[in-house]
Structure formats: structure tokens, C-alpha cells
């Protein structure tokens, strides 16, 4: 990998939006700043001039001014990185960069670090003793590193396990010992004492039985000098301080990017070549551990497993430049002693910590190979956002002082290559940015792409390694020195150990336990986990836990993570995490710092060190307001747009849904499946669609400006879905700080089944865009989360179920509407009469009959129109309806009824016949009520039309293109026209003719039938029966609704009754709750309803009573109210009116009630929108009662528009006034006239025409001679009053006295409805209806025609009270003194044949003149006649 080119530093900064910061500026940072040792932008902390570049730098001896008592802040960094080091400029052999991409000196060991390679005693280390050198160096570096609170690398990532001979338990035990040792050295004296024993142990590391003898890989004689900073010798410390002054870590960081010479080492090259094949998975993320907060930082810098032959020390003081020869073996694990409080103050001092580190047992050391770090696409990446990773890591280490530094992670097996990112929000973040910018590349836990570099850079917070680094003893502040070693283990993992000695300055930051706790509270960290399994990342205090996926982790880590997570969830106000869009940074008290690398860390308010607070710096450079936008951002945006706008090369996936699942599975499946609106893929199950949104293709991190949080998406569809959610609210998604990284294979597969599949996500049941409520400790989905996007949050897999398809929910039981007339149905112990299934309640039985289950032959074609039935039980019960067989089971509710009331129950209570067949468009999911409608819709809205060349297979979408093709390619076809072809949108079949396409639609639409319900009172269609029933309750039967008009107006609720006709079909409305319906279907439905209405008019009285009882009287206007004549009060109910009359006026006469009933119950409504005038052909109607008679057609004046007579109390509509009067008399118990009044009928009553209605006879005045005195009695005893027929209205005459009096002198033609007040004109009109062949007999009173004389005679007697021969004797209406004039008795008295008017006393010679005159009196005569008072 030596030939791999390292990306230019400027390019790296540009790629991750990290502002370019000059190295000098980084060096000039105040020593008290936690991250002063690092360049804010990844630049070195010291001037490049301070460090010698080239081979000579490796030979430089450490500064003699280094004080052995100084307490340098040394950070031990273990990096599992995907880094491509550049080959050394001067050497032919490609050597790892002196500086790793995380900003540390590469394992190639550059000599530019001005540190002598001699032993602590001043002597040069032998080549064979290189193993001891790294050990001591690691000790020194680790101790110093733990003191460095500002170091962003305060978190150490254990990527590899120990040697085969060392178990994890042993490692943990050793860690505890190290922690105890560090605690002992917290005081200055203990630190000095500890240095001496540390040296021998470090020196004897080579002889350790656990590790094989060191194999010198570097030829440079100054091997010892490179490791001397980590050695525990006091002399080393003095040398280190001087060396650091000349060549601090910053220099090493800057060199690889600034083009400073890098040392070439054959040993590095050889080690790399040997292990290159064995390292398929290089660390994907930079693991940094720092114990600034904990008094007992971990002592182990890093231990990785590698082949014994190429063993090198895993850790090297970061401040020390490493020469090829001096490169220590990986087996040497430096131990660091805890930093003393004074050392914390002097965190910038670079004095070497000679005796602080306690050498670890050799058994714990694993031989490791020093190799170049290389990019490996296979390295696993934790499946959680970077911001969330730090929390869990901090959680592990900060739960307890010992746990913070526990080396369990370091001792893990190499397979556990998941990398932890502990991001401390200390002020050292800026300084760490420089190193992280370079090393963040490998740092990305989830992505092994260079963008990870910016992760650490932006995170910029130092973290504690799991016992890898320990703060060293006290020493005078010195320039910062860094020693970096890159190690490749036998398992293929790469470990980088960095030992750094801080320069002079305040005490080491974050060295105390309290500071470590502060880190836990102030940052979000990931929990370590297995390679493929993610653990939940606990978020900082006030921060919601933000894991992206679950990782399998050690029990100790999980325990620590769970503690922090519980703590976080209890304290956090917002704990919402989107399945596909994971909130990465949620601000607590400080603004969110979205890290480009995926980790966003908020800086802590202050870190306490020795009781003091350290100033905090932004956790991420992205968080700073003045961040410089990288010049490569535009290219990144272009790549992002390309991803979003690129066309999917694969065809859209559509499952084969031709065979539905078995009904017992209960899997409701749409005809076209569940479709992703972003890419067009469809899935058979809703769970599959949820998985589709949760798939992991790449990692896209953006800061959503609308959500005000950092979000991570793992595929394009989830990002577009999030943007769609904003669009639905009228917003355009705006995002910033874009970061894109690939994901590893381990992340792409296998992470979705970490939770039981059968468990349902709590947010699935909620409507889109509503947040789900989850119990404490779990991570609820954000309000912007879509139900299909919800995915299990890492770490909460055990508590929060993964998204899954919702099981088929039983439909809500729709109980029958109340029906007073109908009898209660029998439910035999709530047992289904069809399948004998037993239920516990009526609601369950009703639900059983209404639940939709796949059933063959569920469509009944015998019904007109056809209907679909929900299940087999309903089908069986429905089929018996057609066969008229018992038991009469309602297909809707399962109840058993008597045959007499069964039909009423079906029509009025359960609305069974409201079922229809609808069709759902597979493309837009719109439901249509008719086959032709949906076919037309699909063809016009979705099907593609192409214009095909008649001479070749080419087809074009436009006629112009096709014609241009013909002209250019086929010039011979001069008059040829492109042929239109039609492509089916559902199967891509092409047809040359549209009728063939329509026929083809039938094959698809047969599978797209859905249940729809049509309101029986109007033409509205509903997809749910419950919606239809609510509509009926509110619009047609509600108490708050005015007296309902016939269902023919455009609005059944508000249309006045006076403007409608008998045709019960409202104008078509496109309401939101309606389903689409074709015009032809509407007419068909209207005709059906009209026919049903006609039948209802002829139904028995029982049905009419049912209608009356069901409908609640609610007047619409004054004409429909009960009005008191005395006080002019109005009452909506008849009972209220009667009570008022009795209580207020003391009497309620039947005659007065009769008149009021006629006024209240009878009103005429016309279907046409505009009412015709009341005068036609000069005939003016002046009706005393409020009954509109505008029946005449406005155009012809001869035909009527199916007028309907409306009963306001029963809300029934009748086509004939006679039927309405009968209904009022029979159903409401009111008669117009009493028998006592009828005795005077021959002298006082004048016949008037009945209202409109086919077959009803007119109520013309009987002009035949006066009957005998007993005529009135005959009128009362007319037989056959109950006969029915077109011209035989039952007991019509008794209902007409009031009507006759109000319509005095009006003659109406029954066949056509023509009305006139002129008898002669009426006689001239009626012959036009006479049929000489079929019905030669015509009644001159009303114009009705009959086939036989007997029928005519019976009609005259029943309808007009004319006996045989009377009609002949009285040819004109005025010839009968009995009926023709109220003064007929006086006419006889006159003797001269003259007649006089009883109202005004005028005398006339002819009865016809009297009849004409009498019409001028109107109600005056009626009033006089009723009260028997002379006028």
C-alpha cells in the first residue's frame, strides 16, 4: 500500500467543510486551551521550523531541558483507520506517512521529531531492544495523553483482541491494576516514584514471555530515541521536552500535508507487504481515547493482535518522532500512570514522563506488525451516527473512574472491529480537529471513507481511551511531542498508537473523574459493539440518545450504555429519532455542532479540572458560525444532486400479486402492492416497504434547516421521503453541511433483523407525520417520521419493536340504524347462523359479517346494480334473500328477522342494498363507482400514447417527432401518417386500437374491485360504509337537519323542498367524501331510485308508517310548521301545537287541526331548479292554502315535471296529492272533514281537482243534477274507497273538501296535469287524451280514460260521487245546483230557475254564471261554510 497516494490536506479540508487553518495559528493557540496541542484545522500545533525535517530529525536527541518531574499531558491514540499514506518523497521505498491521516505521526517513524532515540539513561537503544522502547514510549505517551483533556482523541477504540494467550478477562484485570496504579500516582511524589519501576518493565518488554523477541524492522540506529519519550526515565523526559519544543505534534501533523519530507523505511514497507493481504478490514473509524476527566486514565495505549514475527509496540509517544530502526514492536504496550492534579494544570508541558507509566505484564502484550495504514472497504462501521457514537463510548468510560479507563475494549478480539468514537466536548476539540481531519478518515465508524476524517476534526473533542492512555507524572511544561505508531494485526486490523507529550501550559485538561463525567453529560457517544451488531448510543445529558442501529457489544459496555441511555432519556425533552433520518445533533444549551464525519458534539459548558473550569470551544468546526466553506463543497453538492436525480438503472420492482394470499392469513394486500413514491418500487407487504426505506446504501448526513437538527439518511428514498413530508406542509426542504459516505457490506446486510419481525412499530398505527408515543427509555420517532420509515433504534431494539406491517384490523362494527317500525332481530346466543362460529357479543357478530375476507363468487350479479359482499357468511345470507328462504339472516349484522319485517330491516336499518362495486385505480388509488369511468380515467390519465412509424418499429411520444422521423428516414412515404398505439400502464402491453385497450382493462380491473356504498337517498358514493351511515344520519335523518327535501337537490341538507320534484336524484357533486362516478352511472342510479320511489308510493301503509316514524320532523320553513291562527305562533311538532291550543286557547277543533295539517304537511316541490310562474296562459292561480301548484312546464305549459308532494312530518315524497292525503289521514290520524260536516256536503262542498299524480282523478265540480237528499249519506258509504289503481284513489273524496274549497273552481286534467278554471276550455282539452281503441270511455270531470263503461261508472261514483246517469243529466258544471253553486237551495226557491250566491246574495240566471262568480270569494265561503255563519 506504499504506492497509495495520500490526498492533499487542502482537498481533505475541502471535502469535509473544514476551514483551512494555518499551522502557525494552531501553534499560537493559548496553552491553557485544551486543544492547544493540536491545530484547529488539522494543522500542526508548532511551527514547522521547530522540528527538523528528514533523517536528521530522527537522530536529534531529546531536549536536555526536559524535567523529569514535569507532568506532560500525553495522549495515547489508537486509530483503526483507513488511511492511504503517501510514499516518502526521498526514499525509493514507499513508507507510511510520518503523519497519519488523523493528524498523528505515522508509524513510519519520521525523524523530524526532535527527540533522541537514546534510552532514558541517555544511551542508544539497541536494535534488538526496540520492543522495550515502544513500551516505555507508550507508557510515557499514554500518561501524557490521559492528562490532555483537550485532546480530541480522548477516546480509544479497541479494534483488536490481545494475543491468543491473553484473554479478555485477563486484560480487564490488568486494566483494573493499571487504574489502581494510576490512582496511586495522582500525587506528585507517587508519580516520581512510579517512574523508576516503569523503566525496567518497559525495557524488559522484549524479554517478556508473552511476546516473542522483537524483530528489528528499522535500520536507523536511533531506534531508542524515537521511543524515549514514552520511556519512564527522567532523562528521557528532559530530552523529550527539548525535542517537543523543536518538533511538536503539530509539526508532525502538518508535515504529511505540507509536503515535509517523510522518512522511508524498508521495515515499514516490508511489514506492510507482509500483512497487506491479511488485513482485509482496516479500522473504519478513528478510535481516540483520552482520560482528561478521569483521575485514573487507562494505562494501555493499544494492543492489537498481529503475527508474532512482525511485532512492534502498539503505542509510541505521539510527541516523539519514530525512526525506522527505533520503531517498537507491537507487543510492547506502554502503561501510563494516572496524572496528578498538578499535571493536569501543566497539560501543555511536554516533559517526558519517565517513571509514571507502569509496565504492563508481558502476557498482556501482543506482538504486532508495524504496517502502513491502508484503506479497506471491508472494515466494519458501527451503524449509528457519529454523534451518537461518542455518547455511548463516553458512557462506557465515564460510568465509573475505573470503567472510564477500563481496557476491556482494547482487549477485545480482533473481530470486534467496530470502532468507537468518544467525542469529548472539551475545549480541545479545535486542536483535535487538525489530527482528526487527517485521522478522521479512518475514524468513521460506519463508513470507511476519507470523509470520516472530518468526523474527528469537527468533533474536535478529546476522548478517553479504554485504559490505553494514562496521564503521566508531573513534569515541567515542554513543547508538545508526538510519537505515532501504526500497527497491523494478524487479523487484518490496523492500530495506530499515538503518544503525545503536551507542551508547557496549564494542567492537563479533563484529567479528573469529574471532567470525564462532564464529557458523558455533554457529548453523545456510541456504544461499542460487535462487528455487525450495533449497540445503542447513549446521548449526553439533556441529549436524546441517537443510535442509528444496534451493535453487539460486550456486557460491560452495554451496561454502561444502558445506564447513560436511561439517564439521557429521563432528562431529555426530545427523544425522537427517525428510522431513516436519525437526528445526529440536538442542541442542549449550546448550538448543535454537526460533524462532517458524522459525529456532532456539543461543547460542554466547562470542564472541571482541580476544581476549576476550563473554557469550552465549539465541538465541531461546522458548528462555528464563521466556518469557511470548502471549495470542494460545490463538487460534493453536484455529486449529491447526481445521486438524487440519477435514473435508476434497474427497472421498478413489482411483485407478482396475481395469486392473493390465503384468507386465513389475514393479509390485506392492495392490488398494486405497497408502492414507494420515490423510486416506484412496489412490495407485497407493508413491512417490505418499511424495510425498503430502511435499507442502507450510503450514508447521507445533512442538517435540515426546518427540523433544526442533524439527520442521517441511508438511502435516497428515505431522504426524499423526508423532503416530501416538508413539501406536504408547503415547505421546500433546505439542508446544509452535507456529508456523504459509503457504508460497509456489514452494514448493508443483516442489521434489520436484530429485533423480532412480528413486533409492530408503535408509530405505524399513527397517521403519517405524527409522532408515536413510546415508553421511557425508548426512542420515539420524530413527528416528521413517516410510518413506513420507522426503524428500530440501536440499543432500543429490545424495547422498541421494529417496523412491521400492521396486522389486518377488524372493521369497526357498524350497528344497524334505529328503525321504529322494524322489529328487533334475533341473535341466537351471538352465534353465526352461517358458519356456526360463536361470539361473545352482538358487536363481534356484526363485525364477523362485515369483515372483508377473500371469498370466491363474492359478487352478486342477480342484484341490479350488482354488489360485492364482504365474506362467505354474508354471501350465503344474501343468496337466500333471492330464494326467499328461511332463515332470513341479515347479511350485514347477522341477525335473524321475520319475513314481514326483513325487507324493511335490509333497506332502512342495515342499508344492505347500498352496496356497490367500485374500482380503484392502481396508479393513483382513486376509487371510481363505474367501470366505464375508471377505464376512461386510466386511458386518459395514465396510459401512454405513442405514434408509431408505419414502416419501422420506431415509436414516438409526439406526432411531430414521428412525422419528422418519417420525413427523414422514409422519404418515400409521403402521405403516410403515424399510427397511434396505446400502452397499458398496468402491464406495458401495447394495443393499436383504443377499444382493444378498454377490453384489455377488464383483465386488470377484475382484480381491482373494491367495496363502495351508495347513499340510498342521494347519489353520493363512499368507500367506507361507516362514512355513508354518518352521512345518512347527519344529512338525511339527523335531528339538526331541516325538513329534508327529496334527495334530488344538489345538497340534500340545504335544498328547499319547494324546489325539487319527485325524482330522487340530486345534482352531481364532487365532494371530498364522494367517490368518482360517471355521468351514465349517475343517470342509471337516478332511474333506479326513481323506480324505487314509485314502488314506495304503492307500498302498503306499514312502510309509509315506517318512513314517518323513522324520520324526525324538523320543519324547514314556515309552511311546514304548525302555526296557531290565534296568536300566530309556530311550532315544529304537531304535539307542541296541540298542547299549545289546549293550554292557551282551551280548544282544538278537528276542523282547525285539519286545516293546519294540510298547511303543515302538504307542500309541493319541483325538481327543476327554477320554479315556473303561477300563471300560465293567462290563468292566475290564487290558492288560499300554502300549497304551491306550479306544476306546469315553463315551456309548454301542458306537461308537468313529475311534481312531488312532501309530508313534512314523515319526510315522505309522493307523486300524487291523493296519496299524500291518504298518508296524512292514515298515518297521522287526521281527516280533513268530519262526518258531521259531510251531511252538508251536497249544499256546501264543491269538488276540486286532485293534485298531480299519474292516474289520479280530478276533483271537478259535479255538474250533474243534485242527488237525492240522501246523497250526503251515500258519500259517506261509498264502497271501494280502498281500491287502488291509476284512476282509483282510495277515499279521495273525503280528503278533498278542504282542497276543493281552497281550489274552488279549478279543473285539472289527470293524464297531463293541465289545470284551468274554465269548464269549457277544460272540456275542449281532455279529448286529446282519449284513446278510441284502447280506452274509449273518458271521464268528463277529470279526463281519465277507461276501457269499459263499468270502470268509468265506478270511477265516477268513487271519485266524483256521481251515480249512474248523473253525469249525463248534468253536462256542465253549473247545471247542478247541489254541486254547482252554494245557493242551490235558494235556486229552487226562486222558481224562475235563477240562482243566488249565498256569500254576497247576488242572483244569477245561470248556474254557470253563479259558479264563475263564486270563485271570486275563495276562503270567505270556506270560512262561512265551516262555521255555518251567514255572510
Swiss-Prot record:
Protein's name in the database: Zinc finger protein 687b
Zinc fingers, C2H2-type class? 674-692, 830-853, 919-942, 947-970, 982-1004, 1013-1036, 1122-1145, 1205-1227, 1307-1329, 1337-1360, 1395-1425
Task: Enumerate the residue ranges of region (Disordered).
Answer: 24-481, 504-538, 754-816, 1041-1120, 1225-1310, 1362-1392
Q: Where is the composition biased (Acidic residues)?
A: 1080-1111
* Chief location category: nucleus
| Domain of life of the organism encoding this protein | Eukaryota
Q: Which organism is it from?
A: Danio rerio (Zebrafish)
Segments of skewed composition (Polar residues): 103-122, 249-267, 342-359, 781-802, 1058-1075, 1373-1384
The gene designation is: znf687b
